[in-house]
């Protein structure tokens, strides 16, 4: 698993267990990045990003509408593949995350 995935999953406040929407989106994009050109099915994203099936569907719809991932419908499932725009967004988000952590802020 991508080492940056663990950075996104770290909790700055151990008593607070919830991720922001941006944290969830970053987790989904990280899974999509790890899967590369072959893409990821919903169950794989759900398992690796620790989200329900329906939460993954909702977020992937938003990411597809924004052009950050593309959806390919197979015989039995959807495959989600990160786009070039999604890769650029994810890289910029990683830089932002590092900056935020360096000044001890929680996004």
What is each model feature region?
Residues 2-13, 91-107:
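Amphipathic alpha-helical dimerization/coiled-coil segments
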Residues 16-51, 55:
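N-terminal helix-turn-helix DNA-binding core of bacterial DNA-binding proteins
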Residues 39-42, 72-76:
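Short, surface-exposed loop/turn segments at secondary-structure junctions
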Residues 64-74:
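A short, conserved structural fragment
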Residues 75-91:
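Basic, amphipathic "hinge/linker" alpha-helix immediately C-terminal to the N-terminal HTH DNA-binding motif
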């Amino acid at each position: 698993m991508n080492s940056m995935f663990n950075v996104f999953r770290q909790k700055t406040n151990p008593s607070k267990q919830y991720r922001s929407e941006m944290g969830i989106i970053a987790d989904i994009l990280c899974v999509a990045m790890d899967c590369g050109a072959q893409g990821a099915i919903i169950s794989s994203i759900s398992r690796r990003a620790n989200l329900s099936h329906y939460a993954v569907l909702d977020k992937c719809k938003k990411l597809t509408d924004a052009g950050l991932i593309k959806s390919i419908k197979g015989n039995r499932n959807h495959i989600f593949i990160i786009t070039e725009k999604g890769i650029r967004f994810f890289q910029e988000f990683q830089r932002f995350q590092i900056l935020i952590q360096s000044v001890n802020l929680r996004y």
